[in-house]
Amino acid sequence: MDIKKLFELAKPYLEKNDFGVAHTRRVFDIAQENFAVPPELRELTFASIILHDIGGSSIKDQYEKGPEIAASILKQLGCDESFIQEVCRIIGSHHDHPDNPSLPFRVLYDADKLVMFSPEEFPYYNSRAAVNWEKIVCLIYSDGARRLAEGLLKQRRREA
């Protein structure tokens, strides 16, 4: 799959989100830098990451509109139906926290949580009264990503 082409096709939809394409790029980069994804799962993982917020800014829109938009884009790229269905299943539930998710789901979920600790996004989330940083850290699946989040949280709090 041509990841660059997927980003191009997704861009008009992602630009409508709160953090825009930059958020998706940050999640993508975090995943590439911090998670070992086996070659046979890379396309599924990275397509899911690129398309995870495609439906809009709200979780409701992401879950309801996202899979339909994602399926259309993936069909344009010639992806097979089982691949499309799996990407749509992942993006249509990526804010949930299932007990035993697939590796592509875990990588997306953890990278999407880690981006919250980035210099670009932390101030936004930290200004919201309902954010419980310790709970967010605990929800991260990977031990390594959890340790990274703990370190980033300490750093961001020192900077604030």
Spans of features found by a protein language model:
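Divalent metal-dependent phosphate-bond-processing catalytic cores, especially two-metal-ion Mg2+/Mn2+ enzymes
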Residues: M1-K5, K11-P39, L51, C79, ...
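Short, surface-exposed loop/turn motifs that are enriched in glycine and acidic residues
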Residues: N17, G56-K60, L77
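An active-site-proximal "capping" alpha-helix that borders the catalytic cofactor pocket
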Residues: V27-F28, Q62-L77
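Membrane-helix interface segments
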Residues: E40-L41, F83
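His-Asp-centered metal-binding catalytic motifs of divalent-metal-dependent phosphohydrolases/nucleases
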Residues: R42-Q62, G66, V87-H95, D112
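Short, surface-exposed acidic
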Residues: D80-V87
